[in-house]
């Protein structure tokens, strides 16, 4: 076939005596007499077009990313990132969620962040261990009453309740002494496992009750006389 186009004067036998006409009629026009020249021009024309059509660098990156990140169901189009990173960054996460989120180009900032994350986790773990290992001594806690426990309750102070034994001993002491000295108050607090403040408040309330009872029994006495009588007694 190629030899036929190269040599246009190749003799061809036709029926009916038309051989002379075939030799006189040219196969190509005057502009395309040489078939080899025609094909060479076409090749140079195609090469020139290919050289003139230049694609930007982002086009190749998009096509490469589309081939890598393409999914079966069809995914969102890839966006060009001038920094050169094709990964989804989430706040507070040190590892990638899946294989698709792994970066194609890892920057220096990303490497530093991966190094800092284990250090932060180690420091947080050490601080938690330090808090859990701290010792709490008895003198560091509030001491309200011995009946509530050896270290007392650290919550809000409520109404103090006394046992029958404590109330009986306090009534005996009040019968003999309506006012207590500091030394006697310390002795009673150690004996009854109470604080000095609790004993002081109990004696104040008991004196108020005793005054009301005496006032009902002896309404003629004035408060001054009652106080003098209490001091004398």
UniProtKB/Swiss-Prot annotation:
Principal localisation: nucleus
This protein's GO CC annotations: nucleus
Origin superkingdom: Eukaryota
Cross-referenced InterPro entries: Antp_homeobox, HD, HD_metazoa, Homeobox_antennapedia, Homeobox_Antennapedia_CS, Homeobox_CS, Homeodomain-like_sf
Compartments (UniProt record): Nucleus
Gene Ontology terms, MF aspect: DNA-binding transcription factor activity, RNA polymerase II-specific; RNA polymerase II cis-regulatory region sequence-specific DNA binding
Regions recorded as binding DNA: 155-214
SUPFAM superfamilies in UniProt: Homeodomain-like
Residue span of region Disordered: 213-233
Motif (Antp-type hexapeptide): 136-141
UniProt keywords, alphabetically: Developmental protein, DNA-binding, Homeobox, Nucleus, Transcription, Transcription regulation
Residue ranges, compositional bias (Acidic residues): 224-233
GO biological process, alphabetically ordered: anterior/posterior pattern specification
Function: Sequence-specific transcription factor which is part of a developmental regulatory system that provides cells with specific positional identities on the anterior-posterior axis.
Family: Belongs to the Antp homeobox family.
The protein, known as: Homeobox protein Hox-B6b
Gene source species: Takifugu rubripes
């Amino acid at each position: 076939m190629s030899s036929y186009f190269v040599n246009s004067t190749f003799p061809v036998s036709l029926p009916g005596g038309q051989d002379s006409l075939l030799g006189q009629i040219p196969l190509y026009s005057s502009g395309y007499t040489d078939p080899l020249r025609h094909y060479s021009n076409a090749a140079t024309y195609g090469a020139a077009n290919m050289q003139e059509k230049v694609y930007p660098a982002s086009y190749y990156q998009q096509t490469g990313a589309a081939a890598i990140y393409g999914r079966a169901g069809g995914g969102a189009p890839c966006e060009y990132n001038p920094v050169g990173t094709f990964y989804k960054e989430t706040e507070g996460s040190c590892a990638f969620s899946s294989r698709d989120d792994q970066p194609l180009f890892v920057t220096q900032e990303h490497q530093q962040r991966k190094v800092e994350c284990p250090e932060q986790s180690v420091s947080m773990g050490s601080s938690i261990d330090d808090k859990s290992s701290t010792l709490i001594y008895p003198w560091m806690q509030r001491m309200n009453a011995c009946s509530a426990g050896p270290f007392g309750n650290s919550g809000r102070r409520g109404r103090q309740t006394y046992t029958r034994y404590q109330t009986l001993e306090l009534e005996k002491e009040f019968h003999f002494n309506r006012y207590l000295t500091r030394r006697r108050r310390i002795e009673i607090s150690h004996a009854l496992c109470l604080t000095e403040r609790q004993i002081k408040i109990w004696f104040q309330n008991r004196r108020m009750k005793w005054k009301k009872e005496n006032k009902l029994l002896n309404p003629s006495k004035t408060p001054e006389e009652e106080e003098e009588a209490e001091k004398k007694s």
